[in-house]
Amino acid sequence: MHNLLENLRRRLLAQRTPEPLPPTSQGLARPSHDVVRGPCDADIPPDARNTMMPEGITVEEALAVAELPQKHALDILATAQAIRSVHKGGPAALCGIVNAKSGRCPEDCAFCAQSSHHATGSPVHALLDAETLLRRAEELRQSGAERYGIVTSGTRLTVRELATLCEAAVRIRRETGIALCGSLGQLTPDAAACLKEAGFSSYHHNLETSRSFFPAICSTHAYDDDIATVRAARAAGLRTCSGGIFGMGETDAQRIELSATLRELDVDSIPVNLLSPIPGTPLQHRPTMPPMRALVSIAIYRLMHPARDILVCGGREATLGPWQSWIFLAGANGMMVGNYLTTTGRDMADDLAMLATLGVRA
């Protein structure tokens, strides 16, 4: 193993991730500086989770790992896997989503099928009713998913849509018990507080890419708008889930730049998406990432974030193909199951069988 990797491995393995907080009689965690390791930490205040998060490698070290020759790729994965097994060694975290409002988005994100700027033929529908949202929640709960992401297109929800969704959330929580995650666009502090009160425990809002590459991907809103949304969610006591998409033309250094920003924001969970080029979008002819480059990039994120959840989500089928199980060898500790927003995911039974074979899920 390369000396750089061996030194990083020793240093990261020497750090200790505190055990999950014990529940109180009310079912919430006692205030503490400890960090929670498991995926089902919806009721733990963010400040109680992350104040003693083990330190990952520096940006300079991450760049050095990215520049190692291809012959060291397996050693990079092995290093990340060792870190994952110590700091995030529990069962694989699983989440699923529903496309609760689709299409006609005014944003011009170059990768997105739902943008009104692109001719993709993507489905268009208004906000789903409570019964449909409840049915999907129950399906995901029965499949083993711990978290249910409700995703809507558009810059942000209207006041009426937000109220409708919060009413549905109360019922979903009462009847299924599944943890709720909102992915509803830009968020104000008042909207974040409303979601928290309705029973949402986390909020997902991707930065998509690094600040330096963002202008090549989107021109209709500012990078700081997305950062403000993540901060508003965290300030409201919501668990924050934010990541990006690999393979849009960014460099290794820009993926690492995004990782550093996510660390500064102290997010709880990092979803990694791999570009699946969609016809009609500006990135339709973009080749998919080489599988090993994608896996090495995931591994570098694990080295930078030893104890945060890292979930591989959209695009894993197109980019990784038969190597999908390698995401866990690369340091990921979870994945999205079921279908995505506008594309079909792998059969859930196949994913669950894969997880059982790997021993990361019963």
Curated annotation (Swiss-Prot):
UniProt-annotated binding residues for [4Fe-4S] cluster: C105, C109, C112
Chain intervals for the UniProt region annotation (Disordered): 14-39
Keywords annotated in UniProt: 2Fe-2S, 4Fe-4S, Biotin biosynthesis, Iron, Iron-sulfur, Metal-binding, S-adenosyl-L-methionine, Transferase
Cofactor entry: [4Fe-4S] cluster; [2Fe-2S] cluster
Residue ranges annotated for the Radical SAM core domain, each copy included: 87-316
Signal sequence annotation: none
Transferase recorded as keyword: yes
Entry-linked Pfam families: BATS, Radical_SAM
Gene Ontology MF: a single term: biotin synthase activity
Assembly: Homodimer.
Family, per entry: Belongs to the radical SAM superfamily. Biotin synthase family.
PANTHER family membership: BIOTIN SYNTHASE (PTHR22976), BIOTIN SYNTHASE, MITOCHONDRIAL (PTHR22976:SF2)
Name of the featured protein: Biotin synthase
Taxonomic source organism: Nitratidesulfovibrio vulgaris (strain ATCC 29579 / DSM 644 / CCUG 34227 / NCIMB 8303 / VKM B-1760 / Hildenborough) (Desulfovibrio vulgaris)
Lineage, highest ranks first: Bacteria, Pseudomonadati, Thermodesulfobacteriota, Desulfovibrionia, Desulfovibrionales
Gene name per UniProt: bioB
